[in-house]
């Protein structure tokens, strides 16, 4: 069995899990998420714990059991606490403003960028150079953060661009004559 799959997923109070065939749904205070469980993975509910096992001893099925356990754990954390990613804008005149489901970005181009946020993701701008992306789906929050960062990645000479709050930008020295 996968080392990851050996650990059970503990369900906190207020989180409901329903298993109908291969469809697993998780409901919590912040919302609900669904997952199609792979046919080679068996999900066992014991009280307030979920255990995962491969249906046969095949190496690929063991790995899939660990992957499914990690996905379900992220779903449980998402519906109970939620996920957030923080981005910083570094550069003169770089600004961000959240208006509903649209994020307006001024990143030094000749035109402003209007980024339409997908359903299930909310963006906040505590100030003009910070963006907070929040949601219950870890993959979607990370995807949105990566797409916003891709508009203007941090460049290595001055460090200007959109970066994750915890990101360390590798700097280069300018050419000398």
From Swiss-Prot:
Organism (species): Ectopseudomonas mendocina (strain ymp) (Pseudomonas mendocina)
GO annotation, biological process: cytoplasmic translation
Record keywords: Ribonucleoprotein, Ribosomal protein, RNA-binding, rRNA-binding
Keyword Ribosomal protein: yes
Gene3D superfamilies per record: Ribosomal protein L6, alpha-beta domain
Protein known as: Large ribosomal subunit protein uL6
PROSITE patterns according to UniProt: RIBOSOMAL_L6_1
Recorded GO CC terms: cytosolic large ribosomal subunit
GO molecular function terms noted in the UniProt entry: rRNA binding; structural constituent of ribosome
Stated family: Belongs to the universal ribosomal protein uL6 family.
Stored NCBIfam families: L6_bact
PANTHER family associated with the record: 60S/50S RIBOSOMAL PROTEIN L6/L9 (PTHR11655), LARGE RIBOSOMAL SUBUNIT PROTEIN UL6M (PTHR11655:SF14)
Role, per record: This protein binds to the 23S rRNA, and is important in its secondary structure. It is located near the subunit interface in the base of the L7/L12 stalk, and near the tRNA binding site of the peptidyltransferase center.
Quaternary structure note: Part of the 50S ribosomal subunit.
HAMAP family assigned to the protein according to its UniProt record, in alphabetical order: Ribosomal_uL6_B
